[in-house]
Amino acid sequence: MQKLQTVNAETLLYEPLEKPSFVVDSLIPTGLSLFCGSQKIGKSWLMLKLCLCVSQGLPLWDMPTMEGDVLYLCLEDTFCRIQDRLFRLTNEASRRLHFAVASCKLSDGLIVQLEDYLKDYPNSRLIVIDTLQKVRTASKDNAYASDYGDISLIKDFADRHSLAVIVVHHIRKQNDSDVFNKVSGTTGLTGSADATFVLEKEKRASDTAKLYVTGRDTPYQEFTLRFRDCSWELVERKTQEQLAKEMIPDVLFRLVDFMRDKEEWAGTATELLAAMRETETIPTVITKWLNEYRTTFLNENHIVYQYSRKKHGRQISLAKRAGDSGDGGDSDIGIPPVTVIDA
């Protein structure tokens, strides 16, 4: 039996360790990624664009790529169809991009085939398997165990060779506020992946789609893409920080402006809205938002929020942090909230 390999905390704290690398900067890490979307949405077009970029060291949507050999297993296509796509996408292709339209299943030799490929092309950076279902075999095992077992074989291979492997998969036709819950199969798939991508259109006939990205080392991002001339082009990219900022109610931005020339303010929620000349927000909602964003947005803007119950109603206190005079100071010293004296 193999002995457990352990590392003590002191070593982890002080020894420089190699950080995960990205084949596409801040988007596609080394390891296993799931790329999911409905049938005929254009997943293969996007995968081919990605493969072309990495094989030539060209940026993908202004994001640098790590140049190297690329293997694209187009297991639902023919070489003729791949050639037609290349005609439409590029005038110049690299000898570093390799295609195959058939392979073994995971259960009968795919990993061995990939190992042999790497012996011939040791500078490979990316392998795309399109699709997962084409390399799986029917199993009577528990669905979660089957999903986890299959995807773990691919992940172990990717980790062992420090390269990126993208597995193309489908999503279910269902409504869910979390797009990642639409990935076909069990959480054994998404739970094993280092990153998960979901490409989704609001309407099937639309030429625009959203690409949702999440992962262990990949920050949550949303991309708006447009399919034009057989190529997915970037319209807009939003980071997790930008998306979080968009969730902040507009009235709180106006509250920051309201407090810009004040050191403190106190009163009821109704009085606050009247002072700000706000007519579209009700008192209970502004109170909820003040509490929800007090440690994030308000704190970032150096505003201290306090709430108390008085004989004549609920009172709100707003104050600038000590040392913040509106000139962008960054003091962390708080000041006591304004005391409201009941008549």
What are these regions (language model features)?
Residues 2-4, 10, 17-19, 23-24, ...:
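Conserved inter-motif catalytic segment of the P-loop NTP-binding fold
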Residues 28, 51, 72, 130, ...:
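Conserved RecA-like P-loop NTPase ATPase core
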Residues 29-33, 68-69:
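Pre-Walker A (Motif I) flank of P-loop NTPase domains
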Residues 34-36, 40, 44-45, 73, ...:
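Phosphate-binding/switch region of NTP-binding enzymes
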Residues 46, 50:
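Hydrophobic positions on the alpha1 helix immediately C-terminal to the Walker A/P-loop
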Residues 55:
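Gly/Ala-rich phosphate-binding loop of Rossmann-like dinucleotide-binding domains
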Residues 87-96, 186-190, 297-298:
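Short, conserved catalytic or adaptor-binding loops enriched in Gly and charged residues
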Residues 225-343:
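DNA transaction DNA-binding modules
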